[in-house]
């Protein structure tokens, strides 16, 4: 009985501490009528990351460009086992810098720093352009 209580306490502690490191802004991406892209700006510090969520359909292509080379972009969503690196030279992208979405549903784009810069608690400003075709 005591072991179950300890396991629950450890799990709760892990959940609470993991979310505290992920402070940042959450944005629901809105594409204006007749437009397939949206632009946002932000600032990340240390291990924080900003999250941009959007809905897309299987087979659509997403292209992300970011103004700060020191910021990384990763995509999470249906049909993606872990995450997909959407940075400029990622092998996941086609020759046009686009990633073909594997399933329909809600996707989450995270903008974060490299581990080295996060450890140094650096702050980075960025502009991001998200396109869905």
From Swiss-Prot:
Molecular functions per Gene Ontology: lysozyme inhibitor activity
Keyword Signal carried by entry: yes
Signal peptide range in chain numbering: 1-22
One of the GO BP terms on file: defense response
Subcellular compartments: Periplasm
Pfam family, one: PPC
A cellular component annotation (GO) from this entry: outer membrane-bounded periplasmic space
Principal cellular location given in the protein's record: periplasm
Gene: pliG
Keyword set, alphabetical order: Periplasm, Signal
InterPro entries, per database record: Peptidase_C_arc/bac (IPR007280)
Name of the protein this chain belongs to: Inhibitor of g-type lysozyme
Keyword Signal: yes
Lineage: Bacteria, Pseudomonadati, Pseudomonadota, Gammaproteobacteria, Enterobacterales
Organism domain of life: Bacteria
Functional summary from the UniProt entry: Inhibits activity of g-type lysozyme, which confers increased lysozyme tolerance to the bacterium.
């Amino acid at each position: 009985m005591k072991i179950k209580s300890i396991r629950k306490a450890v799990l709760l502690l892990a959940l609470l501490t993991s979310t505290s490191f992920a402070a940042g802004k959450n944005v629901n991406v809105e594409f204006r009528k007749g437009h397939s892209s949206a632009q946002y700006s932000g600032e990340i510090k240390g291990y924080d990351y900003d999250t941009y969520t959007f809905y897309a359909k299987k087979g659509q292509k997403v292209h992300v460009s970011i103004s700060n080379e020191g910021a990384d972009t990763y995509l999470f969503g249906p049909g993606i086992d872990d995450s997909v690196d959407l940075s400029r030279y990622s092998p996941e992208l086609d020759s046009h810098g686009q990633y073909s979405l594997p399933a329909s549903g809600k996707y989450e784009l995270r903008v974060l720093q490299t581990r080295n810069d996060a450890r140094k608690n650096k702050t980075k400003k960025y502009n991001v352009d998200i396109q869905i075709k």
